[in-house]
């Protein structure tokens, strides 16, 4: 069934107006609606300017973090260079898409190198599973910088994006039909297409932690759908993209080897943002130190000369591993501890005391108890343990069956974690309060504002009308309890939109049956 929400057809309409209009026409023929979005930066008059966009460049630019819409009204040469213009409009388009995410059903872009660099960041900002197609002259080469770790469909334009002809009309028409098909008959990623209805877990794995991860996955598969990510840099980023998209219910980040590459300088880093989405998600997470005994390089000849004196292990013809040192492990521990200390959900860090990989055990090439000890002790020193954030030491190697059992046990434990509320502090949760005395509205609001200013939590209750007016004026609600009648009266058919002002977007709503 076709979505009632429009598809965005995005391009620099100062130079690609006819192409965007053609794609829009093809989409309309499929029964879908479309909005043409202009992200051009030039004001040079051209034959394309008679094609009017549905969303102007000025409107898109108004969503730039700097909100400097006037900048794009100037000729392109007012920017320091063309790259600055592309960056500016790319950032603005990200803001536009994020702000209007619920108002469109898919996004299709067209462009050369500049247009592709401008449009794809907004696509990467959208959740996995959201329809996104990019027709590009760059799609026959290395598309990693454009795609990142998300599911952008890249289509090579074959001919340059310069007018409608026998070749471009077919390619662009197919791209338009591809987009319409995704929107009309796409799969709901949260439920799959006739797939599992089990909660989804994300888990990181490497070849040298496979026995552990396989055992954990098999133990949990009756209750969960476990999606495994190869911790090769892109794998870690993909996991965190799914986490930030709200598509997983828990995390088993057992193989954190990408941190070693980030800290030391290997080729499989997931970047300095590794773990950010995980610790900020609030999701239950069991984390471990899988494969932190190694830094990854390509073939032996690719290892930088500065590491020639180090312990190297040729994993295969394309992969060479370098054993991490005591000092490097302390730095790795500092990186991980800093991230863990920012966690807002239940998180357990499991330390495999007898080895972090299949080659970090007695008799294997990377066994180094001193280096491992430095890693473990630094983590114990730096991680700020709380009721929800704990370190658990396991007296075995990571691939021993005991470790997998402990990982499963800890995950089940933290998924049933309950916050214990202390209701004995009268300053924050009074148990004896005077009966409410009706009074003039202005007087009530004055008292309300005084309480808000004091920083105390506020619980509001009612059918909706009264508390809505009060919180609209001052805001600061922590908890609002409403009756069904109030929900219908204020928002219509269960919607809370009318009840919740933007400034109270973080307030918690409870419905009384």
Predicted regions span which residues?
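Short, acidic/small-residue loops that bind anionic groups at enzyme active sites
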Residues: 109, 118-147, 156, 227-231, ...
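Glycine-rich phosphate/diphosphate-binding loop of Rossmann-like nucleotide-binding domains
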Residues: 16-28, 35, 45-54, 195-237, ...
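N-terminal phosphate-binding or glycine-rich loops at protein starts, especially the Walker A/P-loop
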Residues: 2-45, 106, 115-125, 129-134, ...
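N-terminal amphipathic alpha-helix/helix-capping segment at the start of soluble metabolic enzymes
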Residues: 423-462, 473
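N-terminal glycine-rich phosphate/adenylate-binding segment common to multiple enzyme folds
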Residues: 78-142
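C-terminal non-catalytic interaction/assembly regions of soluble proteins
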Residues: 6-8, 15-35, 268-428
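Phosphate/nucleotide-donor binding subsite
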Residues: 48-102
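Alpha-helix-loop-beta-strand connector modules within alpha/beta enzyme cores
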Residues: 377-381, 443, 493-513
């Amino acid at each position: 069934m076709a979505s009632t929400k429009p598809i965005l057809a995005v391009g620099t309409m100062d130079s690609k107006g006819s192409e965007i209009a053609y794609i829009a026409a093809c989409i309309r023929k499929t029964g879908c609606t479309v909005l043409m979005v202009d992200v051009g930066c030039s004001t040079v008059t051209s034959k394309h300017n008679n094609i009017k966009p549905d969303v102007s460049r000025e409107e898109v630019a108004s969503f730039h973090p700097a909100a400097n819409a006037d900048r794009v009204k100037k000729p392109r040469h007012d920017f320091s260079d063309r790259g600055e213009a592309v960056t500016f409009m790319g950032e603005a388009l990200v803001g536009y898409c994020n702000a209007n995410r619920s108002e469109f059903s898919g996004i299709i872009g067209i462009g050369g190198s500049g247009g592709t660099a401008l449009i794809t960041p907004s696509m990467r900002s959208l959740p996995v599973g959201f329809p996104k197609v990019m027709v590009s002259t760059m799609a026959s080469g290395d598309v990693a910088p454009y795609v990142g770790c998300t599911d952008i469909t890249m289509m090579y334009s074959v001919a340059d994006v310069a007018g409608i002809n026998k070749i471009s009309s077919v390619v662009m028409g197919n791209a338009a039909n591809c987009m319409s098909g995704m929107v009309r008959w796409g799969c709901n990623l949260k439920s799959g297409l006739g797939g599992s209805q089990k909660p989804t877990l994300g888990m990181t794995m490497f070849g040298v932690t496979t026995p552990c991860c396989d055992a954990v996955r098999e133990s949990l598969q009756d209750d969960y759908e476990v999606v495994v990510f190869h911790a090769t840099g892109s794998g870690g980023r993909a996991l965190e993209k799914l986490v930030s998209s709200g598509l997983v219910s828990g995390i088993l980040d057992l193989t954190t080897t990408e941190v070693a590459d980030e800290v030391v300088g290997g080729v499989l880093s997931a970047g300095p943002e590794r773990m950010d989405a995980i610790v900020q998600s609030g999701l239950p997470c069991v984390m471990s130190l899988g494969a932190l005994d190694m830094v990854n390089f390509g073939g032996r000849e690719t290892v930088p000369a500065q590491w020639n004196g180090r312990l190297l292990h040729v994993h295969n013809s394309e992969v060479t591993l370098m054993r991490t040192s005591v000092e490097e492990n302390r730095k790795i521990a500092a990186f991980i501890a800093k991230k863990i200390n920012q966690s807002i959900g239940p998180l357990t860090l499991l330390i495999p005391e007898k080895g972090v990989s299949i080659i970090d055990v007695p008799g294997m090439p990377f066994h180094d108890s001193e280096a491992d000890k430095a890693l473990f002790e630094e983590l114990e020193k730096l991680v700020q343990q709380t009721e929800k954030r704990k370190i658990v030491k396991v007296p075995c190697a990571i691939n021993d069956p005991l470790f997998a059992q402990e990982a499963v046990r800890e995950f089940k434990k933290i998924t049933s974690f309950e916050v214990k509320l202390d209701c004995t502090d009268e300053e924050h949760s009074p148990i004896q309060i005077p009966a409410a005395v009706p009074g003039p509205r202005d007087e009530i609001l004055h008292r309300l504002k005084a309480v808000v200013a004091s920083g105390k939590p506020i619980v509001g209750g009612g059918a909706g009308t009264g508390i809505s007016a009060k919180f609209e004026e001052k805001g600061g609600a922590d908890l609002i309890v409403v009756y069904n009648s109030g929900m219908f009266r204020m928002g219509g058919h269960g919607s809370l939109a009318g009840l919740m002002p933007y400034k109270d977007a973080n307030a918690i709503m409870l419905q009384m049956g």
